[in-house]
């Protein structure tokens, strides 16, 4: 069970809505993923009407919507987008994204922390996308963020857990859920993230651009379940030395 703020989710997989070939394919993939928490960019939906091609099927699917501020380059822009989302969708939940450089899409740590502190004070449930910086993640937690969402690698890069060493520190010190966001490229990346202690992963590009997004979404669902089950089962410790699983000499002694 994944608990963030006042909500609980059976699934530990968060999904996005971008890059799908059609809204129908998007919804089919989300259903196959089992995800109950779905992000959507405010710049991609018509907030004036709920029959928007992206928004309407998501509402019908019964998932929890997590609007994001993708496209914001400053704290002020992100705060403005957050209030638009709250007014239009009736939710205090927000994925905070501030990335001023369109080439790399790396989160701005200074603007993110500034916006997070203000938005928490204004009653938002803030889930910030951030770099895999243990100090920053702790500061975001201290100002009241409901979770932290450090990147595994740049958005859409499919590189996997390139920041693993820093993610391990973040997981160890966090008292709020840690959701690895960005860079997850194949289901094995998601399984590894859950095995190492992450509470959830957010996957969008890897599902949306697959040749078969629906089956890829199912694969991610199974991978997340496997990673979580493996962690809960108590994996054996790593060793530099070999440890025999069967007696090496007993059968020789028995035959003498």
Curated annotation (Swiss-Prot):
Biological process according to GO: thiamine diphosphate biosynthetic process
Catalyzed reactions per annotation: [ThiS sulfur-carrier protein]-C-terminal-Gly-aminoethanethioate + 2-iminoacetate + 1-deoxy-D-xylulose 5-phosphate = [ThiS sulfur-carrier protein]-C-terminal Gly-Gly + 2-[(2R,5Z)-2-carboxy-4-methylthiazol-5(2H)-ylidene]ethyl phosphate + 2 H2O + H(+)
Pfam family, one: ThiG
Keyword ATP-binding: no
EC number: 2.8.1.10
This protein's UniProt keywords: Cytoplasm, Schiff base, Thiamine biosynthesis, Transferase
Active site: 95
Cellular localization per UniProt: Cytoplasm
A Gene Ontology molecular function term of the record: thiazole synthase activity
UniProt xrefs under InterPro entries: Aldolase_TIM, Thiazole_synthase_ThiG, ThiG
This protein's pathway: Cofactor biosynthesis; thiamine diphosphate biosynthesis
GO CC entries: cytoplasm
Keyword Methyltransferase appears in the UniProt entry: no
Binding residues for 1-deoxy-D-xylulose 5-phosphate: 156, 182-183, 204-205
Subunit structure and binding partners: Homotetramer. Forms heterodimers with either ThiH or ThiS.
Role played: Catalyzes the rearrangement of 1-deoxy-D-xylulose 5-phosphate (DXP) to produce the thiazole phosphate moiety of thiamine. Sulfur is provided by the thiocarboxylate moiety of the carrier protein ThiS. In vitro, sulfur can be provided by H(2)S.
Similarity field: Belongs to the ThiG family.
Listed name of the protein: Thiazole synthase
UniProt lineage: Bacteria, Pseudomonadati, Pseudomonadota, Gammaproteobacteria, Enterobacterales
